[in-house]
């Protein structure tokens, strides 16, 4: 396996791990904020119809 291939492979894995961690943190923040905003957003959607 050429060195450039292993380098690309490791970079992709590292980026994937960072993206996965970032998404999990983002979803937790979204859930915390979502609990507060859910009621307001539902009321807005119903009033827009």
UniProtKB/Swiss-Prot annotation:
Cellular component, GO, one term: host cell membrane
Record's bilayer topology term: Single-pass membrane protein
Species: Spiroplasma virus SpV1-C74 (SpV1)
Location of this chain's protein in the cell: Host membrane
Membrane spanning residue stretches: 5-25
Taxonomic lineage from the root: Viruses, Monodnaviria, Loebvirae, Hofneiviricota, Faserviricetes
Top-rank taxon, per record: Viruses
Stated family: Belongs to the plectrovirus ORF12 protein family.
Keywords of the record: Host membrane, Membrane, Transmembrane, Transmembrane helix
Name of the protein described by the UniProt record: Uncharacterized protein ORF12
Extent of the signal sequence: none
Entry keyword annotation includes Membrane: yes
Pfam families the record matches: TMEMspv1-c74-12
